[in-house]
Amino acid sequence: MRVFLAFFLAVQLCGPVGAQEGSPLAATEVLALDLHEEVLRTQATVKDMFGRQETMHVPITVYRPEGDGPYPLVVFNHGRATDAKRASQGRYRPEMAARYLVAKGFVVLVPNRIGYWQTFGSFDPEYSGCKSIDAMSMAASNQVLATLEFAKTLPYVDTSRWLVAGQSVGGLTTVATVGRAPAGLLGGINFSGGTGGDPDARPGRPCNPVAMSQYWGEIAKNAKVPMLWLYWENDKYWGPDHPKVWHRAWVEGGAQATFAGFGPSGSNGHFGLNEDMDHWLPVVDEFLVRLGFDKPAIVKAPQPTGFAAIDAVDAVPVRPSNKAAYAKFLDMAKPRAFAVSTKGGFGYASGDYAAGRAVGNCQRYGNPCALYAADADVVWTPQ
């Protein structure tokens, strides 16, 4: 599903602004204030496939609910760009997924593993993972466990109830961690997990899929908690069939996992986590409800209220300087949504999960927001 996102970075805050997904944390970056987003650091010791061992700082992005908690935890893990692009792979910010999880009642910790972003350099413990899947998996999983230990120092986190999740190599990391059965772990969510793919050089043909099946089948015997595996048909890293074989190896090895397969998403289904929330959110929500986390968290548009006509720009409760943004919203394709804040700010989105993205884009500046319009209807009720 094609996604178009638009949000204005200066609608609710004065002073320097400018946030970009994956960019290094800079003085001008606008953090998600409503999620209490911040970057903390811990240390981790890891080995590469050659036996070289290093101890380095691991930056951890934090998203959390209001209040003191303690809240259950999700450790969310990033993927790995191809070698040509890894140097520019910045801080991982799965903000929209984190918004859902925080609304569900979780603290979300996102470690930027060693060899990425601020620790990119000569030491890469995930190098040649295609040849040594176990070495790279353990290096990555060790940093999940280091993040868990760090979380025990945070008073708002309950580490006796936690989940692990991730996308691509972060999904591989998730499976490896579940296979270690750490204390307090309740489940794992694997978005498009794997390693050894190259969508440009060999689309749909990872370099060592048999080794992946063997490795996951072997570590499955130690797994104790259920998993949810989510893959998209047009994944250009793994193709449509390899993930099913990997899942079968995991289950036949003695582990529990539900496989959720989705149709094509965008030009490369490998990125369905970001581009196909409309489809995966209900599936993940059902999984979390089964684990006991039943708080509603998926943003849905209310019924039309008749407050104003959809094209009545002057009726929109935003500052006068923001009226033009609503006019732009009216030119967007459906599905689309427009949210307003209590301070006259706004956020809008068109495409996948438009309602949730619009509200998130609006309230990331720290002010409460509500949907004003969805598709061709005004859904806002004056407060």
Predicted regions located by residue number:
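Alpha/beta-hydrolase fold nucleophile elbow
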Residues: 156-168
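Alpha/beta-hydrolase active-site loop
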Residues: 130-155
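N-terminal cap/lid segment of alpha/beta-hydrolase-fold proteins
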Residues: 21-69
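C-terminal catalytic histidine-bearing segment of alpha/beta-hydrolase fold enzymes
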Residues: 251-307
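Helix-coil modules at protein/domain termini and other flexible surface or pore-lining loops
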Residues: 295-383
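Cap/lid segment of the alpha/beta-hydrolase catalytic domain
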Residues: 81-94, 109-139
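Short beta-strand element of the alpha/beta-hydrolase
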Residues: 70-79
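The feature captures the conserved acid-bearing segment of alpha/beta-hydrolase catalytic domains
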Residues: 187, 193-258
